[in-house]
Amino acid sequence: MCIRDRIYGKNPVTELLKSGSGVDTVLIAEGMAPAVAAYYTALAKEAGATVKRVHPNKLRLMTGTESHQGVAAFASEIEYATVEDLLAAAKAKGEPPFLVLSDGIEDPHNLGAVMRSALLCGAHGIVIPKRGGASVTPTVIKSSAGAAERLPVARVANIGETIRRLKEQGVFVYCADMDGVSLRKNNLTGPIALVLGSEGSGVSQLVKKLCDGVVRLDMAAPGTGVDSYNVSVAAGIILYEIQSQRAVEE
């Protein structure tokens, strides 16, 4: 059965997960037979959905029924695009691609703020991971001030592989990190993608090695005990600089 974005019951959830439709979260009741729980966990991971174990009473409250059969799925808040869709959007506008990639941004408020800046600075879309980062939830949409519903979002299984594909298509990939080159010393025109790392550990070393360049934001007051910008603030600064350089290039 389905109530708006909530699908519950063993067969409906199984069919939804196998269909490839966007699913953000699968809830599995505590106490479900281990083999059955493992089956739905495997299906959910294959579909790129987050799995949460919850008390049966909570599942009843969230589905509005006792007939949930121990499992429910929550559909994605938006229709996700593909990376190819994002590149095609740039081509349709006659512009070099300008993409933002999340390498594990976890806080939905940060992701929403990044999306807002990306839209206002002219990015053609944002790429987020299926696992290991925030997906587009109601909190993200609210934090983005509506940008999440206007900015194309692609969700991929592997950010590293996506970077490789973008580079093959002539996109120059930068990431933001403290040991990079000062922001304004970089040429940020042309086909470009900016990778932003997680709040705790930043861009992963594997992803960093794949990037063509690393940009750094300088600080006017070093030694204060505050050693970095919030990821959404850093994103806004870098994205504005990219927008400015691209405007001059035109």
Regions from the PLM with identified roles:
Residues R4-A89:
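N-terminal positively charged helical leader segments and presequences
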Residues K45, I163-K167, Q243:
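Surface-exposed amphipathic alpha-helices with a cationic face
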Residues K18-G22, A88-V181, K185:
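RNA substrate-binding interface of SAM-dependent RNA methyltransferases
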Residues T14, L120, I141-A147, K209-E250:
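Structured adenosyl-cofactor binding patch, chiefly the S-adenosyl-L-methionine
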Residues V36, G133-T139, S201-L210:
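Short, glycine/polar-rich helix-capping loops at beta-to-alpha or helix-loop-helix junctions
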Residues G31-M32, R131-G133, E199-S201, M219-G225:
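Short, acidic/turn-prone active-site loops that include or flank metal/cofactor-
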Residues R4, D103, L183, M219-D227:
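Short pre-catalytic strand/loop immediately N-terminal to key active-site residues, enriched for Gly-Thr
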